[in-house]
């Protein structure tokens, strides 16, 4: 099982546009072979100690894939790459953690 936590920081004032761009591809990504979960999240001010600082511009994509090959197929898909190039100007920063289950 592969988990992905992709933190995307939108340019100031462009978070909603970025969210809408991701919502547009949700059905296609969720239909891909090996995709078990693909969802959008935003920061929640919880007041809990240890939480990362709140940033209203961050959109986090939470993904679950059956294996690394399925994730690679998604990332290397030409339609996804074309879409990503179109939304890249909305992004100030992006980082991705790729995790594997150990239990």
State where each predicted segment sits.
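Absolute protein N-terminus
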Residues: 1-2, 103
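Short glycine-biased active-site loop of nucleotidyltransferases that positions the nucleotide triphosphate
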Residues: 49-54
């Amino acid at each position: 099982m592969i988990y992905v936590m992709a933190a995307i920081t939108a340019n100031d004032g462009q978070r909603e546009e970025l969210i809408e761009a991701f919502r547009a591809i949700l059905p296609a990504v969720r239909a891909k072979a090996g995709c078990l979960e693909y969802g959008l999240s935003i920061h929640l001010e919880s007041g809990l100690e240890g939480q990362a600082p709140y940033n209203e511009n961050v959109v986090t994509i939470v993904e679950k894939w059956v294996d690394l090959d399925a994730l690679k197929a998604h990332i290397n898909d030409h339609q996804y790459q074309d879409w990503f190039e179109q939304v890249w100007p909305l992004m100030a920063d992006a980082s991705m953690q790729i995790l594997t289950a150990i239990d």
